[in-house]
């Protein structure tokens, strides 16, 4: 515990005792004055801040060799860092190699290898310019250029040597970086190839504060590992990357999210995933109970969100997939941990014309409705005292109507999810505005409730118990 945290704890402790009348005011007057003065002095630096790891810990993470570089190919992950980029900057802790895939005269891929391209060793990892400074990456005339050298290639892979770390636009990542030229030749995607366990160290610290309970961090790690491998298995074969770095999948911040606590959670759960009977959905619409008692164990998408608001949701109602561990459970825990403005979020008003425009852009078919005049619940989950919208009906000035999943509506109108925090809310038209009121919870609400996991860990529950609660009828197995 830092001195700042200790000061705040003592201040709260003294205040509560005085309120209860259990302390003699005179005897503790000077102590309280001291604590108050110190707290006031520190207040400007505390407002809006969260605890951060010491700089030394960050420095050590950047210079420590990347674990898992010898992992089997199925346990490497491809993370989309940039999409349709036209330029970026790279920097390195070490020399790097470049491998290119180019079409030959027969249009067959051919590798070309360039060693130590203009990259002397960088002895330090300070915040100043390292060695010769950042390396520019651009695209022009259908070619990707690195440090001014163009490559007639569809794919350019940059492989830093130990500690296998690179910096992309100021953020540090482990592994290698593949630059993939768009078919039109005017942009590129940047994809981070990284061992699974190193990837998780960049996810868990971004998805959950590293000062939370170790058992909550371990539960988060197992859920994130399971989710990653499921998405990779289901979608990775059809594209050049497995997951994006955003909340569309899992938030990934690379080395900036690492800390000793996070690596402890990753290392102590290495290879552990959640499985359930016949996790893959089977023929479309097949309910889990129809798959048979002899179905094999398999991974499933172990979704999770910040604050469920009191009950987790059935994945079928949000994402359209049906898995027995994702049917939804009551959650009496998260209100004890969640910030008040997350558990009960404030009324939000959106301009009606903007709502229509955003819906038209995202779903062109909705233009046939004209201006959106009515948004009504078509399906909702009732949890006694509150309900979560799962499907909504849109009606327009043309007299036509259409339907959307409520979660799709939420993220279309507020892609960051910071204003419309969940679909536990009421929607009404007021003049030229849409009003979202009585909001509750933060996120899609499927799978593990992160605040609930922290509350359970505070009560002494271990990671296995937390996961068994939020993903019933699943169990943990170790892949390696």
Residue ranges and their predicted role:
Residues 38-42, 46-480:
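Conserved, single-site charged/polar hotspot
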């Amino acid at each position: 515990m830092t001195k700042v945290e200790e000061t705040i704890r003592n201040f709260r402790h003294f205040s509560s005792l005085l309120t209860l009348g259990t302390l003699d005011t005179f005897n503790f007057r000077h102590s309280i004055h001291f604590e108050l003065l110190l707290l006031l002095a520190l207040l400007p630096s505390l407002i809006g801040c969260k605890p951060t790891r010491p700089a030394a810990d960050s420095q050590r993470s950047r210079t420590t060799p990347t674990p898992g570089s010898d992992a089997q190919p199925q346990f490497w992950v491809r993370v989309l860092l940039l999409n349709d980029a036209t330029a970026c900057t790279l920097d390195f802790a070490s020399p790097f190699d470049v491998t290119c895939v180019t079409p030959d005269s027969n249009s067959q891929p051919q590798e070309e290898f360039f060693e130590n391209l203009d990259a002397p060793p960088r002895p330090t990892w300070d915040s100043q310019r390292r060695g010769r400074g950042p390396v520019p990456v651009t695209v022009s005339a259908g070619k990707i250029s690195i440090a001014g050298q163009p490559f007639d290639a569809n794919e350019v892979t940059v492989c830093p040597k130990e500690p296998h770390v690179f910096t992309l636009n100021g953020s540090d990542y482990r592994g290698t970086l593949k630059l993939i030229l768009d078919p039109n030749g005017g942009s590129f995607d940047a994809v981070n190839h990284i061992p699974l366990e190193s990837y998780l160290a960049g996810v868990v610290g971004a998805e959950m504060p590293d000062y939370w309970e170790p058992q909550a961090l371990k539960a988060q790690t197992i859920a994130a590992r399971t989710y990653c491998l499921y998405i990779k298995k289901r979608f990775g074969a059809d594209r050049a990357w497995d997951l994006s770095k955003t909340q569309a999948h899992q938030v990934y911040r690379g080395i900036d999210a690492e800390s000793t606590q996070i690596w402890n959670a990753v290392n102590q759960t290495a290879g552990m995933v959640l499985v359930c009977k016949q996790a893959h959905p089977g023929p479309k619409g097949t309910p889990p109970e129809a798959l048979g008692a002899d179905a094999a164990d398999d991974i499933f998408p172990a979704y999770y969100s910040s604050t469920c608001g009191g009950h987790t949701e059935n994945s079928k109602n949000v994402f359209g997939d049906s898995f027995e561990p994702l049917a939804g459970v009551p959650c009496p825990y998260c209100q004890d941990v969640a910030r008040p403005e997350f558990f009960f979020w404030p009324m939000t008003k959106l301009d009606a014309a903007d709502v229509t425009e955003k819906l038209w852009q995202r779903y062109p078919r909705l233009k046939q409705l004209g201006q959106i005049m009515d948004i009504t619940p078509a399906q909702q989950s009732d949890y006694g005292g509150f309900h979560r919208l799962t499907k909504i009906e849109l009606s327009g000035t043309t007299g036509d109507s259409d339907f959307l999943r409520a979660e799709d509506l939420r993220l279309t109108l507020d892609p960051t999810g910071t204003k419309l925090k969940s679909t536990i809310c009421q929607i009404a038209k007021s003049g030229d505005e849409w009003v979202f009121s009585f909001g509750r919870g933060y996120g899609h609400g499927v799978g593990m409730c992160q605040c609930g996991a922290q509350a359970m860990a505070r009560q002494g529950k271990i990671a296995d118990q937390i996961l068994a609660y939020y993903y019933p009828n699943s169990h943990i197995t170790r892949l390696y």
